[in-house]
Amino acid sequence: MSDYDETALVCDNGSGLVKAGFAGDDTPRAVFHAIVGRPRHQDDMDDMGKKGYYVGDEAQSKRDILSLKHPIERGIITNWDDMEKIWHHTFYNELCVAPEEHPTLLTEAPLNPKANREKMTQIMLETFNMPAMYVSIQAVLSLYASGRTTGIVLDSGEGVTHAVPIAEGYALPPAIMRLNLAGRDLTDYLMKILNERGYSFVTTAEREIVRDIKEKLCYVALDFENEMATAASSSSLEKRYELPDGQVITIGNERFCCPETLFQPSFMGMESAGIHEITHSSIMKCDIEIRKDLYANNVLTGGATLFPGIADRMQKEITALAPSTMKIQIIAPPERKYSVWIGGSILASLSTFQQMWISKQEYEEIGPSIIHCKCF
């Protein structure tokens, strides 16, 4: 197995959720909100004792009295003090492990700034005193989880969307495309269109209700114009949703107008290309020899790709953009909300991977820049 006595940990840090657990497991042991909450008022502070902050689901449940911060914005860590609190909570409260005993695989967004990678390495090996660590790009791990090493991954989570072409296990940075539109933006957009219809969703608690409506009732239309016509002429697409207070609301074309923004960001006033176009552009930026393999291995991953109908729509849109002779295959694994974590679990438990770890000793000899030599 490995040179380390204890099982490796796998920690996938997303803008919305932290997924953490043990290498070799099928699913993450802990999944919780990537948030840190602090009291808005001094009186609430006094009730909390010395800690002065809450992390994860506890912060989420007390959101009425707390000011919530997301240390990961659009996939990138922007608040290191809060991120450290989240990691501390992950190891000690969620996984109940001593981090100094476990090598740990962390995930990162594509095109993560060099300084960020070094800072992650430093915190793991110095602050948490880990025996070893490694950092892997999220999209690459999702591809591994699907049983592939070459393909293009469309990863859309809570904070950001990327199209990442990968050849033989290595991401191709010049061809990576990024779209600042993901799950959180879709929730905001659904709130907006429901408010325009006369419903009132304003508070953070009401935002959670809208997120639930999005996750339970929204879907991607194969043909948006046709679907709009159907919704206008009949009630066949309408669904009822019961609010916590017992009131029942009817959701019609909002069901597919909300996720349509992934294909038409202009709905939200963005000038960006849609997910099908960034996927195609990314493929076109790659060498002509590997394009065929990318078209045939198009993997969807992340929570914002869970909408029913999204794979069929991607198939239709990319077929329209690609050369007519090209075989297009869209792969949408049912477990894609956790594909990144699953890929990390597979990778960190491979016997061939054990030489890849950055050991504490190597770190002490070379410093944080070792991350660029060993993780790419």
Swiss-Prot record:
GO terms for cellular component: cytoplasm; cytoskeleton. The lineage of its organism: Eukaryota, Metazoa, Chordata, Craniata, Vertebrata. SMART domains: ACTIN. This is Actin, alpha anomalous. Polymerization of globular actin (G-actin) leads to a structural filament (F-actin) in the form of a two-stranded helix. Each actin can bind to 4 others. One of its GO terms (molecular function) is hydrolase activity. PROSITE patterns: ACTINS_1 (PS00406), ACTINS_2 (PS00432), ACTINS_ACT_LIKE (PS01132). Oxidation of Met-45 and Met-48 by MICALs (mical1, mical2 or mical3) to form methionine sulfoxide promotes actin filament depolymerization. Mical1 and mical2 produce the (R)-S-oxide form. The (R)-S-oxide form is reverted by msrb1 and msrb2, which promote actin repolymerization. Predominantly expressed in testis. Belongs to the actin family. PANTHER family: ACTIN. Keywords: ATP-binding, Cytoplasm, Cytoskeleton, Hydrolase, Nucleotide-binding, Oxidation. It is an enzyme of class 3 (hydrolase).
